[in-house]
């Protein structure tokens, strides 16, 4: 109960920020999220991606953040409280520990969200950086569903005109759950590329909604 209270408090705060900033969000496919722990995989162009997605998590969800976030007092403590994990991108051994902890969380019934580009993509609006395959071990080892999250126009909120915040329309689409066991052997072997193709097709499709 305490965990869910924390989740709802953070969600309330994120929703309040989005309301104040005047961001209008078109949400598609929210009903695709199964009532079970999942691995959310999203493209990443803005700090606001976290607010847009976390504010809609139906169950406890730990986000995988970059290691540098762990150095921020209070924030890092609160993040740990809501099952967030810190990934050291420069240290493969420590990175593996983080993935193993994420696997353990899923087994406990907690969803995980990760942006496998590894950093914010500052390229063209419909571009993506290559997905890092390590994140997908979470689904491969637990058998949980992967739910793709495709986001359009989120960099226009803040990053495109830093430090100003702009009222814009964004699109967030939750894709059909992907269960690794149901994939063809070749797709299972390159699951990162498989999921990235789905997100790429979706952001291309939704560009006309902006």
Give each language-model segment a name.
Residues 1-12, 18-21, 35-92:
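Catalytic core of membrane glycerolipid acyltransferases/transacylases, capturing the structured
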Residues 17-18, 79, 105, 139:
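A generic structural signal for well-ordered alpha-helical segments
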Residues 19-28, 95-96, 154-156:
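Short gly/ser/thr-rich secondary-structure transition/capping motifs
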Residues 27, 40, 63, 114, ...:
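Generic preference for hydrophobic
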Residues 29-33:
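Glycine-rich helix-loop-beta junction characteristic of Rossmann-like nucleotide cofactor-binding loops
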Residues 34-36, 166-167:
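A short, glycine/Asx- and small/polar-enriched loop/turn
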Residues 96-210:
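Non-catalytic C-terminal accessory region of glycerolipid acyltransferases
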